[in-house]
Amino acid sequence: MAFGKWKVVVGILCGAVAVAGLCARAAPQAGGAPRDLFNGKDLSGWHVDAPALDKDPKARSPFTVRNGLLVSLGTPGGHLITNSAYEDYRLEVEYRFAGKPGNCGVLVHASTPRALYGMFPRSIEVQMEHLNAGDFWCIVEDITVPDMERRRGPKERWGTTGDRLRRIANLNDGAEKPVGEWNTMVIEALDDQIKVWVNGILVNHGYNATADEGQIALQAEGSEVEFRKVRLTPITKLSGDAGPATTP
């Protein structure tokens, strides 16, 4: 797998998210420096996929920029998806539940839109739900962790769709800060591995992922969440369990 290659998705086609398989990729472009996926001003480089907007395109988008922050309003349900696909990277996300604690997530290796329940793109979700940050949720993709039966449940019920056991519990439920304070989530995705830290604490490490590249998505899943940093840096190796130094 080539290092530092951004695989650019044709933005116009990706806007037609309701039609699976239309997002073409241009030739890979070399890169290496950290890149802010959120510019602090608008949603350039992203597109919204919210099924409710199919029926009423003038309805309120679940994502906006407010006071320099990217805000997931929580409703209507949907996703904010990058126009580009990425591989071999570190993703730094600074977020907080500004009001009531709730649910949200970061989806990595995202591809086919609305692949599950007519809502969720095919991907691996890194959970941000309050008190469960760092869980993996398998969405028509899969990943393996140590001690799988304890953390996922009986093997015969594992799966990636419908009512199968798709959740893989994190390693530590105590990494989050109190509601209203900023959390830092770091996700490293390299080859078939995904490693996650919350506030410097290792909360998950999976391997044998069934995808190793794709788009990145943020969820609107019922709760208002503010983001002040979404930064991506190419990597060639995973950080140790103590975690990487975050960028200012």
Where are these regions (language model features)?
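Carbohydrate-interacting regions of secretory-pathway proteins
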Residues: 24-248
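N-terminal targeting/docking segments
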Residues: 5-7, 21-22, 149
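C-terminal segment of classical bacterial N-terminal signal peptides
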Residues: 17-25
